[in-house]
Amino acid sequence: MTQVAKKILVTCALPYANGSIHLGHMLEHIQADVWVRYQRMRGHEVNFICADDAHGTPIMLKAQQLGITPEQMIAEMSKEHQTDFAGFNISYDNYHSTHSDENRVLSELIYTRLKENGFIKNRTISQLYDPEKGMFLPDRFVKGTCPKCKSPDQYGDNCEVCGATYSPTELIEPKSVVSGATPVMRDSEHFFFDLPSFSEMLQAWTRSGALQEQVANKMQEWFESGLQQWDISRDAPYFGFEIPNAPGKYFYVWLDAPIGYMGSFKNLCDKRGDTVSFDEYWKKDSDAELYHVIGKDIVYFHSLFWPAMLEGSGFRKPTNLFVHGYVTVNGAKMSKSRGTFIKASTWLNHFDADSLRYYYAAKLSSRIDDIDLNLEDFVQRVNADIVNKVVNLASRNAGFIAKRFDGELAAELADPALYQTFTDAAAVIGEAWESREFGKAIREIMALADLANRYVDEQAPWVVAKQEGRDADLQAICSMGINLFRVLMTYLKPVLPELCARAEAFLNVELTWDGVNAPLLGHKVNSFKALYNRIEMKQVEALVEASKEEVKAAAAPVTGELAENPIQETITFDDFAKIDLRVALIENAEFVDGSDKLLRLTLDLDGEKRNVFSGIRSAYPDPQALIGRLTVMVANLAPRKMRFGISEGMVMAAGPGGKDIFLLSPDSGAKPGQQVK
């Protein structure tokens, strides 16, 4: 190994924990994984980490809609996300969550250092407030009519029709997306990060030459328009970390989200019992390399706020950002109605992971270009390249080696010059992997595959096999073909981990980057089994149809009682524990003079009598029928003075009202006074 081993930390953008992973996400995670696998093959110390981005208003509100706690929701999402990434063989060393002890400690540390260094400012701002939900509204949680083009139903920050940007206060007839209420303006003290103080440092970082040209150019535009102070706080209710010494104020999700990179790495170090590496990687003068693989939509946060936060709190800055474009399918934005908004899990029900990994790699470069997943081209390319060119090379030769030579390869290379051509290509292909010019690497490898297949075509082992006295030639030709296959698979190992594992089992040797310098001579291979099957358009059709069906299922309207009476906001166990429910015997029931809705119930709690007024008369026109029944009551409800007397509790009933009211009754065996738990 001539290279000096490097210490490298690689991250992907943290998936938001309120939805499933789809093929747009997978572009980034595949791109990063291919680069990481190549670095590992070259002997570098690589730590590859990620986490779920688990904070913010959308998560809080979605959990409420589902009737579960945010903690429950993000735990379920984390399991789903990790299953999807494992299915695509994304080789993370650690996958964590921003809702973690490590992230809380680091977020508070960075904030405290920024505050101590004078980079946190306080000021009062006016925001739209939902009076029904009792919460301030983020821009995307306000909708109204665009103030520019007058298009209805537009978000509070920009119009999707005319493209205009504006303040949510400029919307015409704004409404809260959460409750439908008309928001009002309210003042609140917020905390701001003084980003303009870091303008000079950020411009120097931009000019260093490390960033992609397109990123540097975009940053220059932001510098010219002037950097603004960044609001890093949000008001309760909010799911996130409370700001130290600021009750009711929480860190904005974009403050603690990138710190999640540090939190995940700290968690990994702690799991390993490693007390040294975290500081080695994150200290200001660290010689480790730090790379963030991200989409072009979050460059602003990663190229401005994040390095400035790190600089201001005494940590190192990223070595570079690797930015990619978006994914389109069949030349258009992913569409749920067309079945091209495809979840990662749905893909894996119809295709293997290697097929998408290969197709994305074949199209990726170091530029920030959008990638189109053309499903017809996908089928053709996978079959033409992986099946016809690479796998076919092994299958054309393996049978002869197994049947005629008991799996043993020849002792010498049939064409050393051709083999040298293949091994010499390692420099060009390696540089392409290194510089993230994946498409170029694939083109170079497929050009070699064409050479290998041309060699086999010219040598025609199927003809030689029929000629007497040419066993040595047959063994040499087929051994040459298998050795060339081994080189190709070695170069493809960062992209095709599943296929390469099967190839290693057949070749009876591990595929290592430097290993190709020594061909397999006199080496015994194992029996050949089909390495990869052709894919068909009917699989694509099934995939698209399955995606459509998933959308229909997800969009199915809620019917029945939940539609009429949605589950209310989540409460804590402590809140529930305050309610004292007891079994009660209805000792007497009678009409209430002057009321056509109420019945007066005398309830026996086995030693204590309660007088309760209940609005159940419409369902029980004969109150005498209730006498002697057991029911359930709220025993610690504060007494309520009514026109007819004092009500000392509440009986429990179900139903929408009118005649459809159903008094709850405990199962047989329950006794008056027993607590309902």
UniProtKB/Swiss-Prot annotation:
Binding site for Zn(2+): 146, 149, 159, 162
HAMAP family: Met_tRNA_synth_type1
Organism whose genome encodes this protein: Cronobacter sakazakii (strain ATCC BAA-894)
Protein's gene: metG
Function comment: Is required not only for elongation of protein synthesis but also for the initiation of all mRNA translation through initiator tRNA(fMet) aminoacylation.
PANTHER family recorded: METHIONINE--TRNA LIGASE (PTHR45765), METHIONINE--TRNA LIGASE, CYTOPLASMIC (PTHR45765:SF1)
The keyword Aminoacyl-tRNA synthetase is assigned to this record: yes
Name of protein: Methionine--tRNA ligase
Superkingdom classification of source: Bacteria
